[in-house]
Amino acid sequence: MTTILQRDPPIFVSDDILNRLAKVSSGSLTTQLFKKGYRQPVLMGLAPLNKKLKPFAGRAYTMRFIPAREDIDTYATLTTEPHINNLQWVGVEQVTPGEVVVIDSNRNAAAASMGNMLITRMMVRGARGVVTDGSFRDATELSGMDFPIWSAGVTATTRLSFHHVADLQVPIGCAGVAIYPGDVIHGDGDNISVIPAHCAAEMANLCEVQDDLEAYLALRVQAGEALWGLYPPSQATRDQHKAWVAGGRPVQTLTQ
């Protein structure tokens, strides 16, 4: 008898941690992840479709594509009821508040991963964003939505031409990065980054400290100070930062 091994359920990252992570910079985040041994957490080659950029963080809901096959991926698979060959609709209707849908399109931008109708449905269900390493369609509509939408391109070509939705909520690769269900997807104006779920709370703590420190360092650089001992900060500089915070963060003393 064959034993089918099951992964443990993903660690649940609370909305409180997500909201804190949404406020940290991608620079601090990737630096802190690098210190922990995660060398490349950034999804490369993607850009936001909508101009109303807002920082976000959410739990990954994953969708895995394989190449389409002519005898399966026909228009008839767009069924009016749940069906094994229409998993994309199933996934959209499973999305819960706080999730970011991440689509592994095998870096194939020849056909749209999805379009305005499905993305709108996910947004209404409480998703925090959607990401693909392929393309989306309906860019005119998507660009006006107050919702994070990242992709490698735009095309009107239907998904059925090139993509079959093979799995939901399994480990995937998107834009060269491994993503497990429940990992945190972080986005700002620069990047989409992945945070392993088990270190999300630690990253929130570390990045908040680093962002605060770097805001202080930036003021000193703007005031004309040289980088040596300032950036990266020496222990003396860190102590000066602590004293500055304790003193009420007096900006004028740094810029005079």
Question: Where are the model-predicted features located?
Answer:
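Long, low-complexity intrinsically disordered regions
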Residues: 237-256
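Structural motif
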Residues: 40-41, 59-62, 99-102, 127-131, ...
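Extracellular/luminal Protease-associated
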Residues: 91-133
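A hydrophobic, small-residue-rich beta->alpha segment in the mid-to-C-terminal subdomain
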Residues: 186-226
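Intrinsically disordered, low-complexity regions enriched in acidic/Ser/Thr/Pro/Gln residues
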Residues: 1-93, 100, 215-236
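Buried hydrophobic positions in well-ordered alpha/beta secondary-structure cores of metabolic enzymes
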Residues: 33, 122, 183-185
